[in-house]
């Protein structure tokens, strides 16, 4: 097993200690979240009772294969806890998420939860967000106009950089909701809240990967052990 996976498993195992019998869980998307699902499934086999809302079809499939009971936000609109990964996390626990393409559902599930705990390895911790391209989920209609509006909004925030339509097998990547994703390489984002507000003002933007004031804690695994970051 490579070192990166060991760290993901270590963070997932620590997060599992926050999960109590009978909880309603939001279950994230991505490689670290999948390690959490595998560990959770082992506890479920031993009689541990939880019910989860998956943030993607991929996560739902893994939960079903491993025997983790699932529900929906229609049936269970209020969740106790969401466990999810992140592409970047800063000292204020602002996040960039969406590298796996599930940012809309991830944000809906996180917002429906009493708290959100992020699991990641040390490489995801940054001083300022923006090293990882910011995923922006957009409506397929009017793509060119939406990209132009994103560029203009970024300039007003003092940002600029390439906007690339995400592709998969040579065709535009489609989210579970049927939308496109534009990956924005703005570089450092010193004021995530201002950028967030500017993006939400664009009609063609469905959601973006800035998660602000959603995470309560981040469990970070490094070669020197586990540490927990808490939002001030």
From Swiss-Prot:
- Entry GO MF terms: ribose-5-phosphate isomerase activity
The family database entries (Pfam families) matched by this protein are listed as: Rib_5-P_isom_A (PF06026)
Q: In which pathway does it act?
A: Carbohydrate degradation; pentose phosphate pathway; D-ribose 5-phosphate from D-ribulose 5-phosphate (non-oxidative stage): step 1/1
Mind telling me which residue stretches traverse the membrane in this protein?
none
Q: Which residues bind substrate?
A: 29-32, 84-87, 97-100, 124
Catalytic activity entry: aldehydo-D-ribose 5-phosphate = D-ribulose 5-phosphate
Assembly mode: Homodimer.
Instruction: Describe its function.
Output: Catalyzes the reversible conversion of ribose-5-phosphate to ribulose 5-phosphate.
- What family is this protein classified in? Belongs to the ribose 5-phosphate isomerase family.
Q: Which HAMAP family match?
A: Rib_5P_isom_A
> Protein name, please?
Ribose-5-phosphate isomerase A
Provenance organism: Brucella melitensis biotype 1 (strain ATCC 23456 / CCUG 17765 / NCTC 10094 / 16M)
Which gene codes for it?
Answer: rpiA
């Amino acid at each position: 097993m490579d070192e990166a996976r060991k760290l993901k498993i270590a963070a997932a195992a620590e997060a599992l200690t926050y999960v109590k019998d009978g909880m309603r869980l939001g279950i994230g998307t991505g490689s670290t979240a999948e390690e959490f699902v595998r560990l959770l499934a082992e506890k479920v086999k031993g009689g541990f009772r939880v019910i989860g809302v998956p943030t993607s079809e991929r996560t739902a499939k893994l939960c079903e294969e491993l025997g983790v009971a699932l529900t929906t936000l229609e049936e269970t609109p209020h969740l106790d806890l969401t466990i999810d990964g992140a592409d970047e996390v800063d000292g204020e626990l602002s996040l960039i998420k969406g590298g796996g393409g599930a940012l809309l559902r991830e944000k809906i599930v996180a917002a429906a939860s009493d708290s959100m705990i992020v699991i990641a390895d040390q490489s995801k911790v940054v001083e300022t967000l923006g090293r990882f391209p910011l995923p922006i989920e957009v409506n397929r209609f009017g793509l060119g106009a939406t990209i132009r509006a994103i560029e203009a909004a970024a300039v007003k925030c003092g940002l600029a950089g390439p906007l690339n339509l995400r592709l998969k097998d040579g065709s535009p990547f489609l989210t579970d909701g049927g939308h496109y994703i534009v990956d924005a390489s703005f570089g450092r984002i010193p004021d995530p809240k201002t950028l967030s507000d500017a993006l939400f003002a664009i009609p063609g933007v469905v959601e973006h990967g800035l998660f602000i004031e959603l995470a309560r804690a981040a469990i970070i695994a490094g070669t020197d052990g586990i540490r927990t970051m808490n939002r001030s």
